[in-house]
Each structure stands twice: as structure tokens, then as C-alpha cells.
Amino acid sequence: MAKKSKIAKNEQRRAIVERYAERRAELKEIIRSPASSPEQRVAAQSELNRQPRDASAVRLRNRDAVDGRPRGYLRKFGLSRVRVRELVHDGSLPGVRKASW
């Protein structure tokens, strides 16, 4: 089980990323666009730098939905490998079977 504070911090970051996502995308488009002038690029870059660090999506951590485990995360299920294994053995994940060949 992950620390409650780490799980809460990650959720707080997720909210901040969501709040700033649209504006960040606009600024990045201005920076990348060959049609924008150098002054516009500098202004967009400085505004992007003024935003909070936690507004960047790369600072998010994928965590197990059940207990918040940060490692061994499987995107398909939103769970860690340990939790997936437990649920598969219990038969709680429909359509998933142990591999055999």
C-alpha cells in the first residue's frame, strides 16, 4: 500500500494538469509553429515557464487504482501486476486466463 500522502499528491497533480492542459497545448503550438514570429515564440516560452511545474503531464505517475502501488502498472487494467495476478487467480477479471502453450 502506497503512502496516502503520495496518492493524494498525485491526484492533486492530476487536477493541476487538467486545469492547465488547454493553455499549455496552445503555447506549445505557438512555439512549434513555423508561422509564428520569434517574439511570439519568446513570449509563449516565457509564459510556459511561468506555469507551475506540476502543470506538466510528465510529472504524473500511473498508480494502481486499488492501493496506489506505483510500480508494475498495467495500463490495460489500471492495476499493478500484483493486483492483476490476484484478481485473475480469483476469477474476478472476466476474459483473462493464465497463459498456456
From Swiss-Prot:
GO terms for cellular component: small ribosomal subunit. InterPro entries: Ribosomal_uS14, Ribosomal_uS14_bac/plastid. The keyword Lyase does not apply. SUPFAM superfamilies: Glucocorticoid receptor-like (DNA-binding domain) (SSF57716). GO terms for biological process: translation. It comes from the Bacteria. One of its GO terms (molecular function) is rRNA binding. Residues 31-59 are annotated as: Disordered. Keywords: Ribonucleoprotein, Ribosomal protein, RNA-binding, rRNA-binding. PANTHER family: 30S RIBOSOMAL PROTEIN S14, SMALL RIBOSOMAL SUBUNIT PROTEIN US14A. Belongs to the universal ribosomal protein uS14 family. Part of the 30S ribosomal subunit. Contacts proteins S3 and S10. Binds 16S rRNA, required for the assembly of 30S particles and may also be responsible for determining the conformation of the 16S rRNA at the A site. This is Small ribosomal subunit protein uS14A. The lineage of its organism: Bacteria, Bacillati, Actinomycetota, Actinomycetes, Mycobacteriales. The gene is rpsN.
